[in-house]
Amino acid sequence: MNFPWDQLLVKGNWMITMAQIGAPFLVIGLIAVITYFKLWKYLYKEWFTSVDHKKIGIMYLICAVLMFVRGGIDALLIRAQLTVPDNKFLESNHYNEIFSTHGVIMIIFMAMPFIFGLWNIVVPLQIGARDVAFPVLNNVSFWLFFAGMILFNLSFIIGGSPAAGWTNYAPLAGEFSPGPGVNYYLIAIQISGLGTLATGINFFVTILRCKTPTMKFMQMPMFTVTTFITTLIVILAFPPLTVALALMTTDRIFDTAFFTVAHGGMPMLWANFFWVWGHPEVYIVILPAFGIYSEIIPTFARKRLFGHQSMVWATAGIAFLSFLVWVHHFFTMGNGALINSFFSISTMLIGIPTGVKLFNWLLTLYKGRITFESPMLFSLAFIPNFLLGGVTGVMLAMASADYQYHNTYFLVAHFHYTLVTGVVFACLAGLIFWYPKMMGYKLNETLNKWCFWFFMIGFNVCFLPQFILGLDGMPRRLYTYMPSDGWFLLNLISTIGALLMAIGFLFLVVSIVYSHFKSPREATGDNWDGLGRTLEWTTASAIPPKYNFAITPDWNGYDTFVDMKEHGRHYLDNHNYKDIHMPNNTPVGFWIGIFMTIGGFFLIFETVIPALICLFGIFGTMIYRSFQIDHGYHIPAAEVAETEARLREARIKEREAVSHES
């Protein structure tokens, strides 16, 4: 084994040196706290090895929030560098590393786990399922994601981060990027991508096979519908990325030449592979976000969603078109007029089903009895801001005009107006909306609204000036500029906006901490003043019982739960409980994640033998699992009856309290 020790530490940058010093203390402090409070056994038994979809969802959300912080710090460093002209705060390569990691973290390690966390918590409950179709695979999927996340974040302090942009184009990411940085990108995303693909398959089967028998596809809640269609995109889009990452890994480690022109390779092959995955990836995070808005808007408008079936078809149309637009990411790379025209038209077409969704949300609001809780505020702010992102997207879809906009800050502003308002607003709204389902209490609404106003205003202050900067010719990925360029004032305003967004996020963190100690607990499950419209609100809070539903609920129409509440009925009115079979926890995913992390680390530094040993460890873990005789366990009917009696009693008390107040 010839490990490249000389590449291990990044030298010559004060910021990275401070991180290298601080990171070990942070890890030691975390270990000390867990040891002091004797939490190791609890965490391992109840969380790390859990196959309960709700606990796995919470672990995804914790990781997503942490990555939001990491990606947000990267964004603030970018804005700090560009605040004034000729700034020496960051040198050029460090700046390249920061904007490269910012993009990867926000898409792969923040937005996706945020969405997957909400999938895990909400979808099985919305369809009346006891668990996902493959509980053990669900645990493995999380630890594959976690392994990729850890590896990618190690790059900042060990070996150096990737600096070829989040798109990692060849040949820049090939012979022109020596060192382990790009290897971190390839291996971390590959491992995380395997977990994502497994999650897509798992939830596709879960929705198809585990939903309550009375629930028809066109009657499913929109969040579940968007999840189902998104899983199809995941299953179709991630294999090309897997192939592309594998090919570039062999180029860099085993000296193949798939993307090296001098040896007969083709750099444009990477661009096509990447964007065949990359543009559907946008809809992998956007479509579930649309589903979140489609749950929140009817709830706080006190109306059923307008045009439910048209929303389903619009979602399917967007998913189909998402695979026909990838070339619009490189109109300027010499494809020719015919190809550019085809992809220009297909890109514009995607605005039609998206417009259907926008009009349906507006018509849902029409004549609704709207209340402005913080999830609703994020949902309402999404509509006009996302519209601006969509309109500028249509502008970019015009191939001839794209020659002016391409690789300028106009493009940066466009995709932030789509991804931040479309995805981040939805993630924050969904977190607040379903937080009482997870924890049994609502986040403080005053602090939530401060979060919303700072974040929303800061977002527009930050990114609206970037449209003007782009039209004025400021290139993206530029680490500095001269005073004579005339970009100082707008960059200063943009940085102020980024600081306002950071303050808004801090209000959310304060809300989480404050609410943990101060918010009243609500055991009834229908936590938003009885406004819930779907099956997850029929179950108890916090964290519904492991079995979710004591009996299989009926779902005879989109407003089944609303009708039940209006007539004073509940699915628990049937008291004929039986023993419930549940799967046991398993350490398989946890240990596969450890082997993946260690093996991936050695492969990043091109040390193949230890990586192969870890690969054998993964196979050994899988063989161990295959020879286990594990039939799960049963929750006795008496225990189920006791649990459900407590929920029924809490609901009766709540109903009596409401009647007394009225």
Curated annotation (Swiss-Prot):
Subcellular location: Cell membrane
A Pfam family reported for this protein in Swiss-Prot or TrEMBL: COX1
Record location of the 1'-histidyl-3'-tyrosine (His-Tyr) cross-link: 279-283
Cofactors, names only: Cu cation; ferriheme a
Co-factor binding comment: Binds a copper B center. Heme A3.
UniProt cross-references to PROSITE patterns, sorted A to Z: COX1 (PS50855), COX1_CUB (PS00077)
Membrane topology type: Multi-pass membrane protein
Pathway(s) per entry: Energy metabolism; oxidative phosphorylation
GO cellular component, one term: plasma membrane
Catalyzed reaction equations: 2 a quinol + O2 = 2 a quinone + 2 H2O
Cross-referenced InterPro entries: Cyt_c_oxase-like_su1_dom, Cyt_c_oxase-like_su1_sf, Cyt_C_Oxase_1, Cyt_c_Oxase_su1_BS, QoxB
Single Gene Ontology MF annotation: oxidoreductase activity, acting on diphenols and related substances as donors, oxygen as acceptor
EC number(s) reported in the record: 1.10.3.-
Primary subcellular site in the record, as a coarse category: membrane
Role description: Catalyzes quinol oxidation with the concomitant reduction of oxygen to water.
Protein name (record): Probable quinol oxidase subunit 1
